[in-house]
């Protein structure tokens, strides 16, 4: 099985779509956790305008670039539902744009590895507030098998998860 090295930034695209028309409401607001899942927001949303919130469409990712005080984990989640969410403008939202090269579920498996948490912490910059920037995310070098092999790995992983539940 041959692997090909890519820069992640060549395979993903930043999304800056905002909820500018208030299409999405309070029930669509989510947060992400260090368990790498979307969660209900814990913020007091009373009187908060949702127009600057970023749109997280199905199959999109959202992460918090600030890595300080996160238990050495990065806060990132993959929208694996058919629903569209909105997140605070402090998040970075992106999607896999080269779907013929990279499977989004395979990428999420990559993000769930402890090695990725260590990588993102090591490449976070700042003093009081360390940040894993979009540029650092794009600079990641990732070795990928063919898209068919990626999909097989994802299928095996999901089958293992289903057997555990």
Where are the regions a protein language model picked out?
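DNA target-recognition patches
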Residues: 9-49, 87
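A short glycine-rich beta-alpha junction/loop motif
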Residues: 84-90, 125-151
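A short beta-sheet element
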Residues: 58, 62-112
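Well-ordered mid-protein domain cores that form the structural environment of catalytic cofactors
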Residues: 108, 112-113, 121, 141
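Non-catalytic DNA-recognition/assembly elements of restriction-modification systems
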Residues: 1-19, 139-165
